[in-house]
Amino acid sequence: MGAVKNCVKILYHKEFAIMEKNELKKLNEEAKKQYDELCKQGLKLDMSRGKPSPAQLDLSLDMLTHCLDGDYMSETGVDCRNYGVLDGIEEAKRLCMPMLGVAHDEIIIGGNSSLQLMYDTMARAMLLGVLGGDKPWGKNEKVKFLCPAPGYDRHFAICQSLGIEMITVPYTPDGPDMDVVEKLVSEDELIKGIWCVPMYSNPEGITCSDETVKRFANLSPKAKDFRIFWDNAYCVHHLTDTPDTLLNLLEEAKKTGKQDMVFMFASTSKISFPGGGLAFIGASAENIKFIKSQMTFQTIGYDKLNQLRHARFFKDFDGIKEHMKKHRALIEPKFKIVLDMLDKEIAPTGF
């Protein structure tokens, strides 16, 4: 770490502008030497964002080996090896409903990716429209979307791939700047929605305040087919004994009669297996009926064996919460090491 500290001091030296050429040359040679020393260590660090460690993946291994044991029938008698059940088996719904805070008729269990669910939801809106809309979004001269920033680049990539104009909304310590959001959506009917990661949003870990959630729920968009894409990816991913809390957007929207404005998403990707978990969408019962009527042309049903594995492994929402404590035990010490080293080695340089 000492070499890294020295490199940082060199890279962020505050007196470059007044140094002589020979001093700069010497400093460059010193930095190159230290860089070469780091390279010689042969470190193979996977810095990919959001990938659980092998130890974290091991936490769910029994799901793959002992959960089914030849019994592939759901509790309602569905053979999960076969076709059918568009919106997910009962026990999978019951497992995932508390993560979003929705009722039985307000959820669809999808495949292995919430990102895919979000993309599909956006694509259907563009091609087919949403509940209450008079035409598909794509039939408008232009489609605009509010994008709180900093935000999730893959959300923005969805917009980019579909030719949707993105409008930046600044973040505050309470979440997206709702003064800006309220003004923009009330003035422009081509603004069809907004992205939001409401809990522990990267990179600052911001969770939307109660007031922010209530203002989301009470938005009055000029577009009658406006939708909030509420990507609650980290709804159970707590690392402290005093976790953040988040109001239930759908329940708040029901109080204002605007529940059809809400699409909520989550998954077990960072709970069980990335790329091998369960993804799900929550919305009003009317929205769910409408979405299912569109989805029926897209799929006969998702992977029910995976749904059954998850339901039997976790058993219930309490099982998920206990499982997340095991993740915390593995992750929290790593956070502490990084933060301690940043404070010790980098902070003294003034950054």
Role assignments for model-derived ranges:
Residues 193, 227-228, 263:
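Hydrophobic "anchor" residues on beta-strands that sit immediately upstream
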Residues 54-55, 164, 349-351:
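Conserved PLP-binding catalytic core of the aspartate aminotransferase-like
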Residues 110, 251-332, 341-345:
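Conserved core segment of the aminotransferase class I/II
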Residues 12-16, 337-351:
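Short, intrinsically disordered, charge-balanced linker/junction segments flanking boundaries
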